[in-house]
Amino acid sequence: MNFKYIVAVSFLIASAYARSVQNDEQSLSQRDVLEEESLREIRSIGAKILGGVKTFFKGALKELASTYLQQKRTAEEQHEVMKRLEAVMRDLDSLDHPEEASERETRGFNQEEIANLFTKKEKRILGPVISKIGGVLGGLLKNLG
């Protein structure tokens, strides 16, 4: 009789332990699902913000380029400005698909060039933008003064 009770109690303990392990696994999987959903929400918010910033910069760059080109410039200067604007637009478009852009840009490069690629890209984006903004602000100050 005692043996039956020991087996029954052991069986109850084992089944309770199995249920607690199963509940722990379910709560962990639910937590993982919630974390994944929150990460998706954060990514979508980040993508929307990035899209808005990208749209703003594209519009601002086009406006700056049209203002700059309407001033009296030589054809060579206008061509150079348009080339820079196209490069900046390509860089902004590559923000949507960074893996594809980096694959295209790094084909045939050696390791040193790959290491310096990001600093060159930052300079290529920021250099023309800052110079254009400075030029426009300088022109506005001259017109106001």
UniProtKB/Swiss-Prot annotation:
InterPro entries, per the entry: Bombinin (IPR007962)
Keywords per UniProt: Amidation, Amphibian defense peptide, Antibiotic, Antimicrobial, Cleavage on pair of basic residues, Cytolysis, Fungicide, Hemolysis, Secreted, Signal
Signal peptide as annotated in the record: 1-18
Residues recorded as bearing Leucine amide in the entry: 144
Record-level GO BP terms: defense response to bacterium; defense response to fungus; killing of cells of another organism
Main location as per UniProt: secreted
Taxonomy, superkingdom: Eukaryota
Prodomain positions: 19-43, 74-124
Family of this protein: Belongs to the bombinin family.
Localization: Secreted
Tissue specificity remark: Expressed by the skin glands.
GO cellular component, one term: extracellular region
Name recorded for this polypeptide: Maximins 5/H4 type 2
Task performed by this protein: Maximin-5 shows antibacterial activity against both Gram-positive and Gram-negative bacteria. The only exception is the resistance of E.coli. Also shows antimicrobial activity against fungi C.albicans, A.flavus and P.uticale. It has little hemolytic activity. It does not possess a significant cytotoxicity against tumor cell lines. It does not possess a significant anti-HIV activity. Maximin-H4 shows antibacterial activity against both Gram-positive and Gram-negative bacteria. It also shows antimicrobial activity against the fungus C.albicans. Shows strong hemolytic activity.
